[in-house]
């Protein structure tokens, strides 16, 4: 929430150029409506060095962790439907498998040095 008085507004930043803007907006809207419906109080505004803070909730650190979180999300299934969630799960699992198959230049250099 930014501004004050007549200039008070809610800012929603796009998550990234690779995100579907319609899906991102739909999920953001669903989250806001869920917060209103369930009277969820937002946390206090954070002040300080977010990188040094140890007690903040964390987002997944890898695609595998993100897939596991998505698999468990009943909220998102309710918000956008099982079919959409399953489609994205299939896509992300395929993406992870393809990533796992790649041998990086670091691996080549590191392990050819040892042989």
Question: Which residue ranges define each predicted feature?
Answer:
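Catalytic-core signal marking the mid-to-C-terminal active-site face
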Residues: 1-115
């Amino acid at each position: 929430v930014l501004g004050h008085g007549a200039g008070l507004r809610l800012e929603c930043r796009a998550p990234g150029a690779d995100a579907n803007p319609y899906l991102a907006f739909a999920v953001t809207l669903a989250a806001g409506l869920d917060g209103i419906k369930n009277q969820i109080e937002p946390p206090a505004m954070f002040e300080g060095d977010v990188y040094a803070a140890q007690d903040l909730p964390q987002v997944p650190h890898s695609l595998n962790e993100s897939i596991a979180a998505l698999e468990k999300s009943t909220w998102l299934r309710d918000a956008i439907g099982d079919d959409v969630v399953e489609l994205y799960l299939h896509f992300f699992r395929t993406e992870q498998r393809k990533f796992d198959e790649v041998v990086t230049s670091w691996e080549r250099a590191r392990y050819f040095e040892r042989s």
